[in-house]
């Protein structure tokens, strides 16, 4: 494999010294970039784009041509897993993802198998291999999956949800069925992420987008427990390097200690928590990723720089282990030049903290 020219992102996740704070953006390959829109139009639709390794690699690399980002993230979707399980994923204009065959009972759970990462999901592995080749060792490649709980919310609700009534009904009325589903999903995510690592992902991330809708007790039982199972079973060394694992629960600020106790290398933070507080609580155990509100990218350049400065100051210069990111995905109507201001500000303003 090609030698890695910029390994700052991996070093920061492992709390090793770096000369500036590395940065990437959730959804950095996406609709805010005109070149992405052009490639997506060429593909025809979103899933066709994911399933074409050449085009998936092209959109993964697009933000790196514009901005000096310190990592690339696989262009894919968390719903590849339920789609491969046969739930019939489709997209309705303006409504987001939907499933033709949602999970409603034990028979539905029994029916789904664990998809083969080099079978039904081979297109994802082909994309990973293609991206690694096309990156030529410039920056590391991040692989990812949704968390079992977050995947289950889409599978039981039949798509996106605001109130999560169907899955919460299952959770309280028939918890055994939900545990059966979550267990199957955890086994699937383990195989899926390990296959991404074997195909060339140099770090992996688990997105628990909807963990924050749970009570503290239910978060531990229905979300964290399964992420812990995943962390325990992941390949942690490949190509002679550590493969860092990041867990990200949106609105999970009250559970940082429990998340850190899973043995993950890093925790993703959203913007609702102060990074200085997070560092005080768990900075000795894990690296932190985050945590600027993506909406700040609508602001004037000076305001963006000011926010970057505040977050860097919050993390401080005591110890290492900060990867700068947004607290969630970049919005689709952010001017690309503002993303450039953000990335440049992180590099420039963080250097004094690493002397």
UniProtKB/Swiss-Prot annotation:
Statement: the UniProt record of this protein carries the keyword Cytoplasm: yes
Site (described: Transition state stabilizer): 77
Location in or out of the cell: Cytoplasm
EC number(s): the record gives 4.1.1.37
Record GO cellular component, one term: cytosol
Q: Which reaction does it catalyse?
A: uroporphyrinogen III + 4 H(+) = coproporphyrinogen III + 4 CO2
UniProt-listed Pfam families: URO-D
Annotated pathway, please?
Answer: Porphyrin-containing compound metabolism; protoporphyrin-IX biosynthesis; coproporphyrinogen-III from 5-aminolevulinate: step 4/4
Task: Enumerate the Gene Ontology biological process terms.
Answer: protoporphyrinogen IX biosynthetic process from glutamate
Q: According to its UniProt record, where is this protein mainly located?
A: cytoplasm
Instruction: Keywords in alphabetical order, please.
Output: Cytoplasm, Decarboxylase, Lyase, Porphyrin biosynthesis
**Gene3D superfamilies membership:** 3.20.20.210
Residues that bind substrate, according to the entry?
27-31, 77, 154, 209, 328
InterPro entries the record matches? UROD/MetE-like_sf, Uroporphyrinogen_deCO2ase_HemE, Uroporphyrinogen_deCOase
Alphabetically, the GO molecular function entries are: uroporphyrinogen decarboxylase activity
What the protein does? Catalyzes the decarboxylation of four acetate groups of uroporphyrinogen-III to yield coproporphyrinogen-III.
The similarity comment for this entry is: Belongs to the uroporphyrinogen decarboxylase family.
Q: How does it assemble?
A: Homodimer.
Q: What is the protein name for this chain? A: Uroporphyrinogen decarboxylase
Q: Which organism is it from?
A: Aliivibrio salmonicida (strain LFI1238) (Vibrio salmonicida (strain LFI1238))
